[in-house]
């Protein structure tokens, strides 16, 4: 696929590579990150409808929305659907990289800059939210697992330097 003429879908151009994906089944939207070249400040977050609009194809769909741009290197993302908040890890250079960020899911043009809620990750990668208990978990390529409240308070290091950790998942099993 030729991505040289403003096409936002993944392709050979490193700016177009999709890194993280999250699905909002309630809202019918698919969100993804495109980190761009390393430490270039060219990362972006997009969304589109889960269902391709009638009469369109993946190559010509018109429902792709750019939510955030000029990010260091956005990687993984997750949602707080009740508060319509998008969270993501960013492994680019500080001060805005190696962070966990949050921002409104429904931001439009002129939206405020994303809020940094956690910093000092070592190439931040994985992210999982535990909305019920107001906390999140993050991993980094430095091999550490962290947790904190959704607002960034109550920071904890759960594992330190255990080898490259590239993802994390949180699952709560119902009581029997």
For the regions a protein language model found, what residue spans apply to each?
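Blade-level signature of beta-propeller repeat domains, shared across WD40, Kelch, NHL, RCC1
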Residues: 141-176
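Short coil/turn segments that connect the beta-strands within blades of beta-propeller domains
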Residues: 26-28, 82-84, 132-134
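Surface loop/turn motifs at the tips and blade-to-blade linkers of beta-strand repeat domains
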Residues: 2-4, 9-15, 65-72, 116-122, ...
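Beta-rich catalytic cores
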Residues: 17-19, 41, 70-75, 96, ...
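Structural motif
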Residues: 39-49, 95-103, 144-147
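Hydrophobic core register within WD40 beta-propeller blades
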Residues: 21-23, 77-79, 127-129, 168-172
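Residue position within the beta-strands of beta-propeller blades
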Residues: 31-33, 47, 87-89, 102, ...
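Short loop/turn segments immediately following the C-termini of beta-strands
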Residues: 26, 35-40, 50, 82, ...
């Amino acid at each position: 696929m030729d991505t040289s003429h403003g096409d936002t879908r993944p392709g050979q151009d490193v700016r177009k590579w999709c890194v993280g994906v999250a699905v909002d089944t309630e809202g019918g939207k698919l969100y993804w990150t495109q980190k761009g070249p390393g430490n270039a400040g060219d990362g972006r977050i997009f969304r589109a409808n889960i269902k391709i609009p009638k009469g369109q194809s993946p190559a010509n769909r018109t429902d792709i929305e750019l939510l955030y741009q000029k990010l260091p290197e956005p990687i993984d993302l997750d949602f707080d659907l009740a508060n319509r908040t998008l969270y993501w890890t960013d492994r680019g250079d500080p001060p805005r990289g190696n962070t966990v960020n949050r921002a409104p899911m429904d931001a439009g043009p002129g939206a405020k800059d994303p809020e940094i809620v956690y910093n000092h990750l070592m190439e931040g990668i994985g992210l999982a939210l535990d909305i019920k208990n107001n906390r999140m978990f993050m991993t980094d390529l430095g091999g550490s697992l962290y947790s904190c409240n959704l607002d960034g308070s109550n920071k904890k290091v759960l594992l330190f330097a255990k080898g490259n950790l590239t993802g994390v998942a949180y699952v709560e099993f119902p009581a029997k």
